[in-house]
Amino acid sequence: MASLGHPATFGRATHVVVRALPESLAQQALRRTKGDEVDFARAERQHQLYVGVLGSKLGLQVVQLPADESLPDCVFVEDVAVVCEETALITRPGAPSRRKEADMMKEALEKLQLNIVEMKDENATLDGGDVLFTGREFFVGLSKRTNQRGAEILADTFKDYAVSTVPVVDALHLKSFCSMAGPNLIAIGSSESAQKALKIMQQMSDHRYDKLTVPDDTAANCIYLNIPSKGHVLLHRTPEEYPESAKVYEKLKDHMLIPVSNSELEKVDGLLTCSSVLINKKVDS
């Protein structure tokens, strides 16, 4: 089954699902710590630029879902669906206030003719932000939002891949401090909890991954894409936001690097991967 996760196709995408920001996000979105207020106009501009990079610049077909004021966190579409090849797992987010976000995502993915699996077990919780797919296997963070039963249902859904669980400490999600920066490359933050999680992933895996260590945990959340006309593409946080981490990304000479601002959504725990669901549709379907 290893060919399914062949690194040559890792990062390929044809479509991206995103969702507009509701104005309720500024005051009502969930956040781990009370901090600076969200500048909503700026958040919208940053989100539009992010969507523009994925659509206009990189050529993905954008499926744009409308905002829902009753769902202040709905821009963070990553948490409600895990898509791998032609299958989509509609999750059961750990925060009860977010569960209705899955409805519109399910409709959108049905229109794209993916095989839909719904997480209906009331004992299961899973946020997509806790799911790291490496192209070879899944790592699932066990956090305040994702539990063992959620990880088991993910494993049942994607049977072709090994699934390992990783305890998440001092962070909202597994991908709050790591992500894939290339076909075999894990971007990881420098904090003790991030490094501990990486060690567990390395112990769990039969495969040896390269690592890219960045000083700032949140800057370790980046988006890698393999675009046939452009090659390796990486969306990462800007030098203005994270100068030291940006310097690390700038050493990746084989990648087309696209710095993206995300200062406003980060105030409500949103990182780069949070606001999109990437899908690779076969051309003939």
From Swiss-Prot:
A Pfam family that the UniProt record links to this protein: ADI
pH dependence: Optimum pH is 7.8.
Molecular function in Gene Ontology: amino acid binding; dimethylargininase activity; zinc ion binding
Keyword Metal-binding: yes
Keywords: Acetylation, Hydrolase, Metal-binding, S-nitrosylation, Zinc
Enzyme's top EC category: hydrolase
A Gene Ontology BP annotation from the UniProt entry: protein nitrosylation
Tissue specificity as recorded in UniProt: Widely distributed, highest concentrations found in brain, brain cortex and kidney (at protein level).
UniProt modified residues of type S-nitrosocysteine: C222, C274
Reactions mediated catalytically: N(omega),N(omega)-dimethyl-L-arginine + H2O = dimethylamine + L-citrulline; N(omega)-methyl-L-arginine + H2O = L-citrulline + methylamine
Active site residues of this protein: H173, C274
Modified residues (N-acetylalanine): A2
UniProt: substrate binding residues: L30, D73, E78, D79, R98, R145, V268
Residue positions binding Zn(2+): C274
Domain of life: Eukaryota
Activity regulation behaviour: Copurifies with a tightly bound zinc ion. Activated by release of zinc. His and other agents that promote the release of bound zinc ions activate the enzyme (in vitro). Inhibited by S-nitrosylation. Zinc protects the protein against S-nitrosylation.
Subunit structure: Monomer.
Family: Belongs to the DDAH family.
Protein's job: Hydrolyzes N(G),N(G)-dimethyl-L-arginine (ADMA) and N(G)-monomethyl-L-arginine (MMA) which act as inhibitors of NOS. Has therefore a role in the regulation of nitric oxide generation.
Protein name: N(G),N(G)-dimethylarginine dimethylaminohydrolase 1
Lineage, highest ranks first: Eukaryota, Metazoa, Chordata, Craniata, Vertebrata
